């Protein structure tokens, strides 16, 4: 046994006991003839008193020590109430250096700012710091709480494959060459979606796992190519059942940070969320809802406002902004693909000013403030054009206004469910936003191709896809989507109709999803589920800005790993063995390969 006690466990009741401890050297203080060492392990820090000068002078930061000594009360006035061990110290009798340390690339101190590149390159050192260590331990606790709750509810934890076939699910797959089948490839799963549905067919009525998922996406802010979901699926449930379970999980994990989340959590339709907040993940910690002005400006002479949609959002106190600040808003809008952000300043004296105001009629000027709920001293921002991008711009401006004006209390928690989302969107729009359309049709799924339509659209979704609403539900916290799910399609003919609408004919559907369609032939039960983005959930609990801060070994921008320098080239021998460059004359059908395997 290298130690008898954890450092952080020592208290006044241990005074007089001989203990053996192990840990890393933190701060060292030489007081002439006696030295004090802060020794640290995973449980905390304890002060070690070293009286042998020769021993002390040989120690350096982050040396690994084993110390045997006697627990003593600190001299009066030297207690440290900030430490759990602050009432005691250990008088060292024997000090053994278990390992030395080279000079550090940065200090193991949470009060010292360290660049992210250095932190990720030496992540094993970064994890010794209190903040990163605390985040990873919080993640472990969140895992435990979720598992305990789900086991109590009768859910079974089941691992699904991480080597599967490539199936279009809305993003690009990471592909893995199959050495024993040259020219064939596995794919890493974007989610356990198809397997968890087949588990329902298999009679596992309540399934969950903490699943690793992989998506080869273009770089987006705060995304990781590999990420974690708390993945859940159940048979014989409706939307209310799944939402109720999701709320119980949220309540349980938020209790880890002593926050009580009231339930039921409010529900907002997708249409309302977009109209009122310009986002399908609205931040409800503050108001400042959007106002549609299309009808208000229907007879306008101002060319900019002769548009399919005109909307506005109010910035309280914004009329006092300097010209430089107003110009900066234009640059802000251009970075989001807009031409600019029109505005009217509602002066304290009641006058309207700014470049837009002079283009308005007297009637429009007289009614504008009341129409948008502006007060003297406010600034009114406008967007005009196609409805979707205009609302998105105003929604982003709303959040920016909330931050700039202090309307958002960072200690608040505001949750909502967004329900009744469209089932389909134009495939071109999905591709433009960075997603991958599943088929070659004009329409693709908003959530995924396995989401059921709401019952009232079951007979018409493929005839009028633009109007069809899905049986989907997303949970949002402070403007972050932290989970999403749906009631699934469980009837083969309905699933085939969805595939056909999305441009997958029967042959394509059979090739890509035949195993799922086959399963649906044998009494698939009605089922539904939800998946929480676990990295995002834990980052919110930890109060950090990036999900990288709650992942033990995250990737940096573009999916690069500074620690291992992955991805990296492979050798010529590896390429040959893996069959990366293999060019088959013709890929044999699945049935032929199965027949050969049987032989």
Swiss-Prot record:
InterPro entries according to UniProt: Aa-tRNA-synt_II, aa-tRNA-synth_II, aa-tRNA-synth_II/BPL/LPL, Asp-tRNA-ligase_1, Asp-tRNA-ligase_1_N, Asp/Asn-tRNA-synth_IIb, AspRS_core, GAD-like_sf
A family per Pfam: tRNA-synt_2
Site (Important for tRNA non-discrimination): 31, 77
Residues holding L-aspartate: 169, 215, 447, 488
S-S bridge residues: none
Residues reported in the UniProt entry to bind ATP: 215-217, 224, 481, 533-536
Compartments it resides in: Cytoplasm
Chief subcellular location: cytoplasm
Any one annotated GO CC term: cytoplasm
Region of interest called Aspartate, as start-end residue ranges on this chain: 193-196
Catalytic activity field: tRNA(Asx) + L-aspartate + ATP = L-aspartyl-tRNA(Asx) + AMP + diphosphate
Record keywords, A-Z: Aminoacyl-tRNA synthetase, ATP-binding, Cytoplasm, Ligase, Nucleotide-binding, Protein biosynthesis
Highest taxon of source: Bacteria
GO terms for biological process, alphabetical: aspartyl-tRNA aminoacylation
Function: Aspartyl-tRNA synthetase with relaxed tRNA specificity since it is able to aspartylate not only its cognate tRNA(Asp) but also tRNA(Asn). Reaction proceeds in two steps: L-aspartate is first activated by ATP to form Asp-AMP and then transferred to the acceptor end of tRNA(Asp/Asn).
Record note on quaternary structure: Homodimer.
PANTHER family: ASPARTATE--TRNA LIGASE, MITOCHONDRIAL, ASPARTYL/LYSYL-TRNA SYNTHETASE
UniProt-recorded name of the protein: Aspartate--tRNA(Asp/Asn) ligase
Organism: Pseudarthrobacter chlorophenolicus (strain ATCC 700700 / DSM 12829 / CIP 107037 / JCM 12360 / KCTC 9906 / NCIMB 13794 / A6)
């Amino acid at each position: 046994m290298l130690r008898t006690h954890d450092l952080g466990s020592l208290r006044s009741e241990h005074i007089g006991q001989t203990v053996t401890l192990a840990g890393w050297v933190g701060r060292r203080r030489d007081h002439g003839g006696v030295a004090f060492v802060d020794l640290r392990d995973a449980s905390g820090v304890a002060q070690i008193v070293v009286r042998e000068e020769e021993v002390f002078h040989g120690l350096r930061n982050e040396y690994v020590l084993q110390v045997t000594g006697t627990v003593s009360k600190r001299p009066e006035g030297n207690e440290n109430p900030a430490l759990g061990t602050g009432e005691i110290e250990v008088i060292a009798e024997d000090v053994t250096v278990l390992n030395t340390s080279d000079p550090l690339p940065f200090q193991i101190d949470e009060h010292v700012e360290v660049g992210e590149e250095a932190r990720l390159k030496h992540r094993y050192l970064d994890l010794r710091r209190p903040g990163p260590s605390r985040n990873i331990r919080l993640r472990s606790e969140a895992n435990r709480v979720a598992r305990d709750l789900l086991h109590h509810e009768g859910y079974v934890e089941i691992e699904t494959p991480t080597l599967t076939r490539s199936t279009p699910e809305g993003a690009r797959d990471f592909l893995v060459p199959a050495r024993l089948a040259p020219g064939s490839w596995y794919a890493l799963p974007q989610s356990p979606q198809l397997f968890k549905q087949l588990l329902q067919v298999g009679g596992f009525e309540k399934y969950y796992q903490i699943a690793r998922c992989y998506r080869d996406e273009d770089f987006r802010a705060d995304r990781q190519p590999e990420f974690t979901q708390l993945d859940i699926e159940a048979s014989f449930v409706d939307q209310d059942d799944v939402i109720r379970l999701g709320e119980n999980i949220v309540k349980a994990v938020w209790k880890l940070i002593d926050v009580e989340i009231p339930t039921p959590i409010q529900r907002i339709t997708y249409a309302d969320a977009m109209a009122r907040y310009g986002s399908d993940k609205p931040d409800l910690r503050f108001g400042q809802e959007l106002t549609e002005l299309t009808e208000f400006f229907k007879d306008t002479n101002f060319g900019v406002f002769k548009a399919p949609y005109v909307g506005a959002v109010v910035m309280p106190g914004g009329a006092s902004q300097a010209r430089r600040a107003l110009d900066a808003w234009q640059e802000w809008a251009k970075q989001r693909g807009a031409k600019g952000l029109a505005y009217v300043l509602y002066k304290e004296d009641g006058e309207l000013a700014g470049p837009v105001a002079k283009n308005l009629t007297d009637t429009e000027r007289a009614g504008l403030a009341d129409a948008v709920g502006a007060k003297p001293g406010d600034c009114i921002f406008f967007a005009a054009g196609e409805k979707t991008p205009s609302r998105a711009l105003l929604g982003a401006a709303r959040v920016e206004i909330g931050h700039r004006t202090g309307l958002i209390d960072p200690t608040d928690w505001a949750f909502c469910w967004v329900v009744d989302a469209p089932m389909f969107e134009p495939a071109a729009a999905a591709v433009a936003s960075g997603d991958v359309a599943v088929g070659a049709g004009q329409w693709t799924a908003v959530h995924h191709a396995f989401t059921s339509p709401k019952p009232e659209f079951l007979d018409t979704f493929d005839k009028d896809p633009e109007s069809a609403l899905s049986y989907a539900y997303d949970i949002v916290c402070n403007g972050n989507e932290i989970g999403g799910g749906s009631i699934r399609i469980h009837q083969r003919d309905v699933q085939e109709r969805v595939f056909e609408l999305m441009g997958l004919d029967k042959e394509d559907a059979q090739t890509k999803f035949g195993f799922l369609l086959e399963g649906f032939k044998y009494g698939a039960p009605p089922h539904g589920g939800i998946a929480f983005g676990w990295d995002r959930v834990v980052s919110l609990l930890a109060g950090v800005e990036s999900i990288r801060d709650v992942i033990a070994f995250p990737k940096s921008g573009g999916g690069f790993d500074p620690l291992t320098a992955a991805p990296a080239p492979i050798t010529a021998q590896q390429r040959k063995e893996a069959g990366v460059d293999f060019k088959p004359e013709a890929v044999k059908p699945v049935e032929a390969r199965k027949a050969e395997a049987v032989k």
